[in-house]
Curated annotation (Swiss-Prot):
<feature type="region of interest" description="Disordered">
    <location>
        <begin position="335"/>
        <end position="359"/>
    </location>
</feature>
<keyword id="KW-0597">Phosphoprotein</keyword>
<feature type="region of interest" description="Disordered">
    <location>
        <begin position="1"/>
        <end position="33"/>
    </location>
</feature>
<feature type="region of interest" description="Disordered">
    <location>
        <begin position="506"/>
        <end position="551"/>
    </location>
</feature>
<feature type="compositionally biased region" description="Polar residues">
    <location>
        <begin position="1"/>
        <end position="18"/>
    </location>
</feature>
<feature type="region of interest" description="Disordered">
    <location>
        <begin position="236"/>
        <end position="267"/>
    </location>
</feature>
<feature type="region of interest" description="Disordered">
    <location>
        <begin position="295"/>
        <end position="322"/>
    </location>
</feature>
<feature type="glycosylation site" description="N-linked (GlcNAc...) asparagine">
    <location>
        <position position="622"/>
    </location>
</feature>
<dbReference type="GO" id="GO:0005774">
    <property type="term" value="C:vacuolar membrane"/>
</dbReference>
<comment type="similarity">
    <text>Belongs to the TDA7 family.</text>
</comment>
<feature type="modified residue" description="Phosphoserine">
    <location>
        <position position="624"/>
    </location>
</feature>
<keyword id="KW-1017">Isopeptide bond</keyword>
<keyword id="KW-0926">Vacuole</keyword>
<feature type="glycosylation site" description="N-linked (GlcNAc...) asparagine">
    <location>
        <position position="553"/>
    </location>
</feature>
<feature type="glycosylation site" description="N-linked (GlcNAc...) asparagine">
    <location>
        <position position="4"/>
    </location>
</feature>
<keyword id="KW-0832">Ubl conjugation</keyword>
<feature type="glycosylation site" description="N-linked (GlcNAc...) asparagine">
    <location>
        <position position="558"/>
    </location>
</feature>
């Protein structure tokens, strides 16, 4: 494309705001103190008289004041706000085939207003117009297939302020230096896909999809603007101010492009006809091929949309620009006729004669009556010729094969060769030629069967013996493990092992002592003296338990508790093996009862102790349950 075209005309509205802030703090301190104390003294002077008369009273009051301290800290801030607004009137965007874009912007004169707010200060402010111009020129453009990258560099916006303080006037001048930034973008056509689907021989309508995304364009924007302002202010004398200046600035440039294109093509299928004519009498033949093609038309349309946006400290909008291109391509196919000469060929009939002759049949006569023999001490071997009819799918013949038979002398007196013909297949004859055929059919199968039977019997007996040995070994091992567990892992053995007297050793000693009663008695006495578990179940040999400690002194307020405790102990500890745990725990939880720190032996319960009379003990035993009933 070499023609120039104007994409569109866009009207933009842009707003720029500059804010300056000045802060001037001031503080004041006030103090006040007041203290107040009031003290009063009264004196009573007694006098003689009747009881109904009141005695005179003298009082003295002394006030003292203390003032509290109050501190006030006041801080005042002076702020100056400077704002500037500029509006973009028009913007024109033009492009050509050489990929150079020029952007021009025109701003109308802007009015800047300044305001200063300070306590006890009068301000006279003046306004000044401001104009700015910017030019944007495209440097170069390229199409690449790399990933879209964005690189931008911007120089900071600098501002300088100079202030002059005097008792009567303040002069402030400012200048805004030029700033420039460059933005580089890469545009590339990402993907291209073509789909043709000619499926029928009549009409072909392929679809073509063209996808592209622009990712590289580079252009440089330079902006130069100057701001100058001055004003005269009247300020009260003897004022010192420190001002902080902040100048926020931001810029954003956004450009979005959309490209879409479509290709539609319509093709008519070409019809090809072939005709040939062959003449036996002519000297040549002609083959003509005619091709009929319908013109093919194709149309390509594409559209593009570009949305540029340039926002320095504000937002800007632009109208979408759309361009469409369409082109039509026509393809014409020419008809062609092809002629070729083929030399004639004369077919001469040929006659073939096939003669078949039958396979000659030979007749052989075998003398089967001739028999020869040889013998040893026990066996006679007969040799003769056996007639075989060998039959196959395509061949049949008769032959005689020598045969040997071994017969015991005691079993046969005379032998005659068989005169019948045996029918066999070709494999039998092949085995006889190889020497692998066993002619002695009477002895072979019996010898083979005998070896198989003997081997199976021996293997079965050996397998049964091995299984029996394995089962016996497992049973013996399990019995030993169970016996060891009973001896070493019982409850009594565990207690004896902790105290140094295992029960396993005692059981072995008892079995040895049973042979000699005298030695058994002496060993038992020795063991009872050394083994603390020898008299474990001999209750008569035990000594009397220590006396029960007296109960604690309980006040009269705990009488109900004593009755409750006695009733509770009568019901819960009436069995033979009642423990003193109930007494100790119940007494320790309240004021009464016994001490938990006392080391008492096992209590047998009320009515079973030694300090109770015989009649009372019998009464309690009759009313209480027995040990066997308790276990059940």
């Amino acid at each position: 494309m070499n023609s120039n075209s104007t994409i569109g005309r866009t009207t933009l509205g842009e707003s720029d705001t500059i804010s300056l802030s000045f802060s001037e703090p001031s503080s004041s301190l006030n103090s006040r103190s007041t203290d107040v104390v009031f003290a009063s003294t009264s004196t009573l002077v007694p006098q003689q008289g009747s009881l109904t008369s009141l005695p005179p009273v003298s009082s003295t009051a002394t006030p003292t004041y203390y003032s509290t301290s109050l501190t006030y800290d006041e801080t005042l801030h002076t702020s100056i706000d400077v704002s500037s607004t500029s509006t973009l009137v028009s913007s024109t965007d033009s492009s050509s085939s050489s990929e150079q874009d020029t952007y021009s912007s025109q701003y109308d004169p802007a009015t800047s207003s300044y305001s200063i707010i300070t306590p006890s200060m009068s301000i006279f402010s003046s306004t000044s117009p401001m104009s700015s111009s910017s030019s944007i020129t495209s440097e170069w453009s390229s199409l690449t297939s790399t990933t879209p990258t964005l690189s931008s560099s911007a120089t900071s916006l600098s501002s300088s302020w100079s202030s002059l303080s005097s008792p009567s006037s303040l002069l402030v001048s400012s200048s805004l230096s030029s700033s420039s930034y460059s933005d580089t973008k890469l545009f590339s056509f990402d993907s291209r896909s073509s789909i043709f689907s000619p499926s029928t021989p009549t009409v072909i309508s392929p679809s073509y999809t063209y996808l592209s995304s622009i990712s590289a364009t580079s252009f440089q924007i330079s902006t130069t603007s100057e701001l100058s302002s001055s004003w005269f202010s009247t300020i009260s004398p003897s004022t010192t101010s420190n001002k902080d200046t902040t100048f926020p600035s931001s810029s954003r440039n956004t450009s979005t492009s959309f490209y879409s294109s479509s290709l539609s093509s319509t093709n008519d299928f070409s019809t090809i006809s072939k005709s040939s004519k062959l003449s036996p009498s002519a000297s040549s033949s002609t083959v003509s091929i005619s091709t009929i093609s319908v013109p093919t038309s194709s149309s390509v349309s594409s559209s593009s949309s570009k949305v540029p946006s340039n926002r320095p400290s504000s937002s800007s909008s632009s109208d979408d620009t759309t361009s469409a291109y369409s082109s039509t391509y026509t393809f014409q196919s020419l008809q062609s006729t092809t002629s070729s000469s083929i030399p004639p060929t004369t077919q001469t009939p040929s006659t073939s004669t096939i003669s078949t002759s039958p396979i000659p049949t030979s007749s052989q006569v075998f003398n089967t009556a001739a028999i020869s023999s040889s013998e040893d001490s026990k066996t006679i071997y007969y040799f003769y010729t056996q007639t075989y009819d060998i039959t196959d799918s395509s061949t049949t013949f008769v032959t005689g094969l020598p045969t040997t038979i071994a017969v015991a002398k005691s079993e046969v007196t005379s032998f005659s060769a068989p005169s019948s013909t045996i029918t066999a297949d070709m494999s039998f004859y092949q085995h006889w030629l190889d020497g692998s055929l066993d002619n002695n059919k009477n002895q072979g199968p019996s010898k083979t069967n005998t070896g198989t039977i003997v081997g199976s019997v021996v293997g079965s007996v050996g397998g049964i013996l091995i299984c029996v040995l394995v089962v016996w070994f497992m049973l013996v091992r399990k019995r030993k493990a169970k016996r060891h567990f009973k001896e070493n892992d019982s409850f009594c053995h565990e207690i004896g092992r902790r105290t140094g007297f295992p029960t396993t050793a005692q059981a072995k000693e008892a079995s040895l002592q049973a042979q000699d009663s005298g030695s058994q008695q002496r060993n038992t006495e020795t063991a009872s003296a050394n083994n603390p578990f020898s008299n474990e179940f001999n209750f008569k040999a035990r000594g009397n338990p220590p006396p029960v400690p007296p109960p604690r002194n309980v006040t009269a307020t705990n009488g109900s508790f004593q009755n409750m405790r006695s009733n509770f102990m009568d019901q819960e500890n009436r069995f033979s093996y009642g423990s003193s745990f109930t007494y100790s725990s119940l007494g320790s939880s309240t004021q009464g009862g016994f001490s938990t720190l006392s080391s008492n032996s096992i209590r047998l319960g009320r009515g079973l102790d030694n300090d109770i009379s015989h009649d009372e003990r019998n009464t309690v035993q009759n009313n209480s349950q027995g040990f066997l009933r308790e276990i059940i």
